[in-house]
Each structure stands twice: as C-alpha cells, then as structure tokens.
C-alpha cells in the first residue's frame, strides 16, 4: 500500500445564498478520500482563491495529510510575515480539510477526535432586527415560537438604516428613538450612513422596552460592532446593566483594546470580544486579565480548527467561554467546523447561527439540523458535510465589496463598518 499523500488542492467559489463563499478541497492518492474546509473571506474572495491556488497548493502537494499540526505550523510561517486575514483564511481551508480527512480515515466525526461529545445539542442564537422597538419585539416573538431561547437584538442594523438615503435614516431614527441625527446637507458622499450618538442613546430604550414586554425568561445579545468611541462603549455597557444581557459584543475596536480594562472596572455587563482578531495571541491578555467573558472568534480568520481548539482550551482554564462567529458569510463547511468545536468544548457558551436557504442545503449536503433553537451535526466520519460541485457552479461569485463595509457617519466621515 502506497503512503498517503496530498495530490491536489483546489478552491471552489460559490454563492448559493447570495454571499460569496470559498471552500477548499484537498484530495489524496487514496481513491475517494478528500477533505473540505472553509476559506471564506467574502470581502477579498478572489485574493483568497489566489493564495490557495498559487501558494498553498504547491506547498501541500506530496505531503502527508495526517500531519495536521506540522502542516499548520510550517504553512503559517512559509511566507515569513504571518497572520494576515487572506493567508489565514487560505490556511484555515486547508486545516479544516485535513481534519475532515483524518476523521474519515479514523471512521469518526471530527468532534470525537477533539475529545468527544460534551453535550447533546448546540444552543443557538439567531438575529432579530426592526425599524423600531415594537418591530424588534414582534420579530423576537416569532423566533421564540420557533424555540429560540437566545436572540441578538438590533434596531436599524448597527445604528443606521443600512442605506445611503440620509432622509430615510432620519425618518427611521426619529420614529424609533425620537432623535434627529446631525447630518451634512451638502455633498453627500456615497456610503452606508449611521449616527453613532443616536445609536448609543437608542439601545437602552430598546432593551427597556423588550424586558418590559418579554421579561427576563429569554437571553438577549447585542452587537456594538466597534462603531462607537471607547467612552461611549463604557457608558453603554453601564446603562445596559439593568437589562441583564447575555453579552455585549465587540464594544470597542481592536485598536482601542486597552479601554476594555476601564470598561470592565465600571460595568458588570458580560463582554464578548474578538470578531476582528486574526491571531489567537490577541485574546491572551484579555483572558489573562479577566477582561472578557466570551471569545468572539471567526475561526477561518485565525487559521482553522487547529488554533481554535487551542484557544478554546486556554479560555477554559481561565473561565472564559466560546462564542464562535457564525454569520451568513461563512460556508456551511465552516458552520460544521464551528459546531464540531462546540460539541467537544466543555466551556462552550453559545453559537451564532444564520439560517440556510434551500440552495445552500442542496449545494452542501449534510448541513446541521436545527430543532427548537438547537443544532445537531450528523455522526458521519469527518466534518459530515460534502459539496455538489456541479450545483455549486450554478451560483457564481461576483467578488464585489459588500456595501455595508462602506460605513460613514452623518457628516460624511468614513467609519468602521
């Protein structure tokens, strides 16, 4: 029997849900044995494909796919400079695919290789939004009827109307918050506008309404999306204390991370942090100094399952729980990777989940099953998910930059998305 080795690495781009996705397929010299991994960096999808096809593939071909740690370590430093989001996503796609292969070789789901089941199902949180407090409440009630016990509550997206129409923003903000945003009447620069001051004043009103109407029997999450100043984030966290959030997500930007210490000193609102981090070492001082309660981690952007499991274990030792990023711009393969980590991590906190349409489930057979706000992965060897490449070709990627990243404040200043 010939020694197992990698014979081909390719990138599959597809958008069956209307969002550009990148999936890596690592093939071996054993007939029918291959692995899949998520390398989705939607905002730079073609750059990731180039990184995989032109750099990762030549690096990997001929190597033993079972040497996951060695491949991860050597690939991570092969470009000398490291931990950029493009190469990390490329590395993630490969890393997940190697875990998929190893699970298939062992005849076990990946969660068994990571230590085995810690729970029967995976509690999920879903997203709710609305133009005003009543609309948000109605949408939460609909999710509660579906069985969800955790919901993320936003009003007008992240402090705006998700549009470049300033009049519409003013109308929605005035309707929802009785606040008139300060906006420039001239030379409107194209972009997605929001008002951070109006937003910060509206959020406590939203949660006051929701707790008055829905009580404390459901868990609420709110995402600041790093869109306010550090001082405003501290004020917001303090003001939200009476409403007992499950957590407040990304209250400050990575560039302002030192402010978390002051926030922690002044507020008991639980904090989740790290959606924009690209290196597991970025969480270390936050975990060591007890500045966060949840690791908010985009698994593909830090390099895949291998570093994510290490981060989860380090967090466990320090009383911090997991909250892997689960938006619509990760592939179902990435969703499964998150959930295998969830199943095997005793310090699991919560899993974000974005519903999948029929096209996604057809292109990716083996997607997790959702029942009453819980997710269940199958027990097939590996990650338990596949891809129909013929169907995937019917949903080409456009490679454009998503409009929501073009954020501006009412005076036209470019801002963090």
Swiss-Prot record:
Function: Has low dehydratase activity with D-mannonate and D-gluconate, suggesting that these are not physiological substrates and that it has no significant role in the in vivo degradation of these compounds. Has no detectable activity with a panel of 70 other acid sugars (in vitro).
Cofactor note (record): Binds 1 Mg(2+) ion per subunit.
Record InterPro entries: DgoD-like (IPR034593), Enolase-like_C_sf (IPR036849), Enolase-like_N (IPR029017), Enolase_C-like (IPR029065), Mandel_Rmase/mucon_lact_enz_CS (IPR018110), Mandelate_racemase_C (IPR013342), Mandelate_racemase_N_dom (IPR013341)
Family: Belongs to the mandelate racemase/muconate lactonizing enzyme family. GalD subfamily.
Annotated positions binding substrate: 127, 275, 296, 325, 329, 352
EC number, UniProt record: 4.2.1.-, 4.2.1.39, 4.2.1.8
Name of this protein: D-galactonate dehydratase family member Dd703_0947
UniProt keyword list: Lyase, Magnesium, Metal-binding
Catalytic activity: D-mannonate = 2-dehydro-3-deoxy-D-gluconate + H2O; D-gluconate = 2-dehydro-3-deoxy-D-gluconate + H2O
Gene Ontology biological process terms from the UniProt entry: amino acid catabolic process; carbohydrate catabolic process
């Amino acid at each position: 029997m010939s020694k197992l080795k990698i014979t081909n690495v390719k990138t599959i781009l597809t958008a069956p849900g209307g969002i550009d996705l990148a999936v890596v397929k690592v093939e071996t010299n054993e007939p029918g044995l291959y692995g899949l991994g998520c390398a989705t960096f939607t905002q730079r999808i073609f750059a990731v494909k180039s990184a995989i096809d032109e750099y990762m593939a030549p690096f990997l071909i001929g190597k033993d796919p079972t040497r996951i740690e060695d491949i991860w370590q050597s690939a991570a430093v092969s470009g000398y400079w490291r931990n950029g989001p493009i190469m990390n996503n490329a590395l993630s796609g490969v890393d997940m695919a190697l875990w998929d292969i190893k699970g298939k070789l062992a005849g076990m789901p990946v969660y068994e290789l990571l230590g085995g089941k810690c729970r029967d199902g995976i509690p999920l949180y879903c997203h709710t939004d609305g133009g005003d407090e009543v609309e948000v409440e109605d949408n939460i009630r609909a999710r509660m009827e579906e069985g969800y016990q955790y919901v993320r509550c936003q009003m007008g997206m992240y402090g705006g109307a998700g549009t470049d129409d300033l009049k519409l923003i003013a109308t929605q903000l005035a309707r929802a918050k009785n606040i008139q945003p300060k906006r420039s009447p001239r030379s409107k620069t194209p972009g997605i506008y929001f008002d951070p001051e109006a937003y910060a004043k509206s959020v406590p009103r939203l949660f006051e309404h929701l707790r008055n109407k829905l009580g404390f029997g459901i868990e609420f999450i709110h995402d600041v999306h790093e869109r306010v100043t550090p001082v405003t984030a501290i004020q917001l966290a303090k003001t939200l204390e009476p409403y007992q959030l499950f957590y407040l997500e990304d209250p400050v930007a990575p560039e302002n991370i030192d402010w978390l210490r002051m926030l922690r000193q002044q507020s008991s609102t639980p904090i989740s942090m790290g959606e924009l981090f690209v290196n597991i070492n970025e969480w270390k001082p936050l975990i060591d100094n007890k500045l966060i309660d949840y690791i908010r981690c985009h698994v593909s952007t830090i390099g895949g399952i291998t570093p994510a499991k290490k981060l989860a274990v380090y967090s466990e030792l320090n009383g911090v729980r997991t909250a892997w990023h689960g938006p619509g711009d990760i592939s179902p393969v990435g969703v499964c990777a998150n959930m295998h980590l969830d199943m095997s991590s005793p310090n699991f906190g919560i899993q974000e989940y974005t519903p999948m349409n029929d096209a996604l489930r057809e292109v990716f057979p083996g997607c997790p099953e959702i029942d009453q706000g819980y997710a269940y992965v199958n027990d097939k060897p590996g990650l338990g998910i596949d891809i129909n490449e013929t169907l995937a070709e019917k949903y080409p990627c456009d490679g454009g930059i998503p409009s929501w990243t073009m954020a501006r404040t009412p005076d036209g200043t470019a801002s963090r998305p």
